[in-house]
Every structure is written in structure tokens, then in C-alpha cells.
Amino acid sequence: MTQSTSAPARPHGNFDLLRILFNGRAFFALIAIIIIFSTLSPVYFSTNNFLTMSSHVAIYGLLALGMLLVILTGGIDLSVGSTLGLSGVIAGFLMQGVGIHAFGVTLYPPVWAVVILTAMLGAVVGGINGVLIAYFRVPAFVATLGMLYVARGAAMLMTNGLTFNTLEGDPELGNTGFDWLGFNGLLGVPVSVWVLIAVAVIGMLLLRRTPYGRWVYAIGGNARAAELSGVPVKRVQVSVYLLSGVCAAIAGLVLSSQLTSAGPTAGTTYEMIAIAAVVIGGAALSGGRGSVGGTLLGAFVIGFLSDGLVIIGVSAYWQMVFTGGVIILAVLLNSVQYRGRKKRSTAIPPSSKPGGVVDTVTGNRNSKSAVVS
């Protein structure tokens, strides 16, 4: 006779509801935050405050999208906060004028040149991280931790610990418009939010519609197997850190534009916020799992929670406690989710998987039904 084994029927009802709530936890957490703080403060979800909070979220979101690419490959980038600060300082330095003492002149680059040069700086910082990690086998934690101090120290050296103020520019010098990113809006929405949307769309297309996106997920799943399959693992690793640096530089430009000033301490601990946003969005720190949409939700959860605590007058120290608790809870829930998936996949009988059934005597897989006499 022929023996066959079927997978047990999956329970429905309450189980499905719990699974929906669990998988959509970032979205439901955001809704809960909005409801709670709207109850505690009538101005929390007013139009003006919502737009202000969204402009703050834009900075977190830009950092988190770059961090997502790194985490998808199984890496980590602790230098994004310092890269943000250094990028802002570079932009401020350029806006103040670059003196060429040999010729006795001072150059004032236009804003578009400042933006390009600052983005290039972020690419250089991220590229160095990537080369150290991919080609010199330096652990990502160590390489990016070192770059955190290098970038922050460079920002301090350039400013002597001071802040570049009044970055509006001068019409006579042709370098006005730097504050456009921070204060202007299109269709009633802050420009910084449009920048975040543009970067998110590019990231989504990159991960979903291109071979590069499949490579990123493959490396996070199993880097060795991906390399044996022909994936250019080292080049992809360098590129994700490079893109993370560019995203951090753009975030630095947005923040400096919003403040019309650039200080060497800007972005301190922002790397933790970026990691938190990615994890809250459902990404696995081990790599291979995560999405742009989830990361954006995570950024909104962090941003709306932080601003809500400020509005109701909670101390900045308690804000750190709440943020840390959210990170721990998010990591715990992710661990439960992915451990549960692993258990379910290993619990499925071999005969229910494609490729034939298993001989119930020998345990060998055959392409035809195993016959037991």
C-alpha cells in the first residue's frame, strides 16, 4: 500500500486575528500612539503639528532607509549619526565660504554644489566602511564604531566644537536657498517629507524590481551560498554601506536646513533611532528580512512617540527610557516571530514538501510514492 502524510490543518479564527495583529504590530502601534497622545493633548494631531512631526520623521526615515539596506545584508552601521553631523558641518563650512589664502579669495559655492559635495562626502564615509568590512574582513560593528568616532572627531576639529550659524546665504553671493529643504513645502507638505518619499520609492523599486535587491536579500540569508551562486557579495556589501552614508548625508542636509545651523554634535545617538526604526518595522537583525514600508512605519512610530512625549511634558531622560524599552520590545517580538516561523517550517513532514514522498522504512526521498509491503 502507499503511505502518504498530510500536514495538519491550521487553526483559524482567533489564531488568524492574532497573526494579523502580530504581523501588523508597527501599524497598530502607530495608531495607538496617535489615539493616546491625541487624547492627552488636543494639539497633538492638529494639521500644523502633524506636518511638523512628519518633518522630524523625515530625518529618522532617511537614516533608517540607509540602515535597512545594511541590516538586510546582515550588517550594522553605527556611524550614521556621526556621518549626519559631519555632513551638516561640511555643508555649513561651504555655506560660510571657502577661503583660498594663496590667491586671497573666498569662494561661495551655490547650494546645489553644496548638496552634491555633501552627498559625496557621505558616500566616501560609507564606502570606507564597506571596503573595511567586505575586503579587509573587519567586523561591521568594529569598523562602523571606529568611523563613528572618526567622523565625530573630524566635525569637532573643523568647528573647534562651535556651531556654524546663519546658513541662509547672501543674495549678493548667489548662495541663498539652503533653508528651502527645511522650511518650504510643496502642496502643503514639507519638502523634507517629499525627499523621504522619493528616497523610499527608489529604495522600494531597488529592492523589489531589480537583481540588486534580490542580491541584498540573498546575502542576508546566506552570504556563502549567495557567493557560490554568482552574487558579487563584496561589491554589494560595499554598495549598501555607501548608500547608507549617502542617506545619512541627505539627512544631515535636511536637519541643518531646518535649523539653519550646523553643529558638530548633531545626530548624536541617531544611529540607535535608525536601528530601532528598522527593527520596529519588522526587519531581522540577522539579515534577509525587512521592507521599506515597515521601516517607514518604524520611523513614524519613533518620531510620533518622541514628539508626543515632548508635547505632554515628559522629561528628556524618560524619553530615552521609553525609546530603549520600545527597541527591546521590538527585538523581542521579532525574535518570537522568526523563531515561530522556523519551528513551523521544520515541523512540516518531509512528504508534504515538493520533490516526492519519503520512504517510511528507509527515510529516503523518492520521486515516486514509496510502497511498503
What are these regions (language model features)?
Residues 110-118, 122-129, 133, 187-263, ...:
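Helix-loop-helix "hairpin" substructures at the membrane interface of multi-pass membrane proteins
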Residues 34-98, 103, 124, 131-138, ...:
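Single transmembrane alpha-helix segments in multi-pass membrane proteins
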Residues 242, 248, 258-324:
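Transmembrane alpha-helical segments in multi-pass inner-membrane proteins
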Residues 1-35, 39, 228, 232-235, ...:
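Cytosolic-side transmembrane-helix boundaries in multi-pass membrane proteins
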Residues 26-39, 67, 119-122, 148-154, ...:
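Hydrophobic core segments of alpha-helical transmembrane domains in multi-pass membrane transport
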Residues 16-53, 58, 253, 257-265:
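Helix-loop-helix hairpins and the membrane-proximal interhelical loops
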Residues 140-209, 236-239, 258-267, 343-373:
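Transmembrane helix-bundle core of multi-pass membrane transporters
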Residues 100-147, 297:
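Alpha-helical transmembrane segments within multi-pass membrane transporters and channels
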